[in-house]
A protein has these predicted regions:
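Short aromatic/hydrophobic "clamp" motif used to bind/position activated sugar donors
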Residues: 92
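Short, flexible, basic/aromatic active-site loop/helix in glycosyltransferases
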Residues: 140-163, 168
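A short, conserved alpha-helix in the catalytic core of glycosyltransferases
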Residues: 108, 164-177, 185-212
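A conserved acidic beta->alpha catalytic loop
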Residues: 44-54
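Active-site-adjacent helix/loop segment of glycosyltransferases
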Residues: 196, 200-311
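Glycine-rich, basic loop-to-helix element that forms the pyrophosphate-binding segment
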Residues: 70-87
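Short, acidic, metal-binding catalytic loop of nucleotide-sugar glycosyltransferases
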Residues: 28-37
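Conserved donor NDP-sugar-binding/catalytic core segment of glycosyltransferases
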Residues: 104-140
Length: 314
């Protein structure tokens, strides 16, 4: 892979995850700590008036920023694909707006991509419980006549390494290795689908731990966040997208662990899910803060996918 030259530019696509209110923190850090030439594409679907005004004002201040507003709420894949279609640059970072970058976050990922020939690189991701993700792996083993397929997040072996799929909070992509491939699809698990798609085309993914970002999970929420939050944490929608995942890859999937995480999130949101107001959202913020402290004691296990015996992806 050719190295990054002075004539190259990076495009950073910033998309919402589940809170519009996180745009200021994300974008302020992005402009403070990005040390290579870049431009920004912000995609926001169904945003509230305050968010639209903020993005409009910032766009006027920044000559390297463009904003794409869509009238309706967007799913994860939709927002990313809209941003990718706006990109002409070879190197594209997809950054969720609740992920905060830190000093020297981008150059190590570019160096890793150049040296390893990777199609995608993810940074080391922290959150309130410590390390959120140090790469992700897939495991296959024979059991009862079927291939049981595990996927799990890694928290140890903090070194540059090839991984099976990236956590999607922050990803650097080499678009030259993906000609004509739309890698983001609204199926669940979303990040596993991305990894399987890259593997299908023989493309590699790496972790570069010298690059560090922080995933800033809720709370706090604001009233204006609730429509997007409810869409993101809709268990029925997740089930539908999970069915599409199973059909796409010809697998069966045990959704219990993922659905449990959705139920925990809905419990934290409480009445704010149905009756968003300053009072209900404020109560959710207090309750969720306490719940997060308790949840930090829980160790998550791997999710499981079972493939038919004849269906092994290589």
């Amino acid at each position: 892979m050719d190295g990054l030259t002075s004539s190259d530019s990076i495009v950073i696509a910033v998309v919402p995850r589940d809170r519009f209110s996180m745009f200021p923190r994300c974008l302020e850090a992005l402009y403070a700590y990005t040390d290579v030439r870049f431009r920004v594409i912000v995609v926001a679907g169904g945003a509230d008036r305050t968010t639209k005004e903020y993005l409009h004002e910032l766009q006027l201040q920044k000559d390297n920023m463009s904003v794409v507003l869509v009238d309706r709420l967007l799913m994860q894949g939709e927002a990313r694909n809209i941003a990718m279609r706006q990109a002409d640059e070879r190197f594209c970072v997809v950054l969720e707006n609740d992920t905060i970058v830190h000093e020297n976050w981008l150059s190590p990922m570019l160096e890793c991509m150049r040296e390893e020939g990777a199609a995608a690189v993810m940074p080391l991701i922290f959150w309130y419980r410590g390390i959120h993700a140090a790469g992700c792996i897939l495991e296959e083993r024979e059991k009862d006549g079927a291939v049981v397929f595990h996927h799990k997040i890694m928290y140890t072996e903090i070194r540059r390494k090839q991984i099976d799929y990236p956590e999607c909070h922050c990803i650097l992509i080499d678009r030259h290795l993906l000609p004509g491939i739309e890698v983001f699809d609204d199926v669940e698990p979303f990040d596993v689908d991305l990894g399987l798609t890259l593997r299908k085309y023989g493309l590699s993914v790496f972790l570069e731990p010298r690059s560090v970002v922080t995933y800033s999970a809720g709370p706090p929420w604001e009233v204006r966040d609730m429509p997007l939050t409810n869409l993101r944490w809709d268990a029925a929608s997740w089930k539908a997208h999970n069915r599409r995942f199973m059909q796409k890859w010809g697998v069966t999937y045990n959704p219990s662990a993922k659905l449990a995480s959705y139920r925990r999130q809905q419990f934290k949101l409480g009445l704010a899910r149905w009756y968003p107001s300053r009072i209900t959202v404020g109560l959710s913020n207090v309750g969720a803060s306490l719940a997060n402290r308790l949840q930090s004691l829980v160790i998550r296990g791997p999710h499981r996918i079972t493939w038919g015996k004849s269906r092994q992806l290589r």
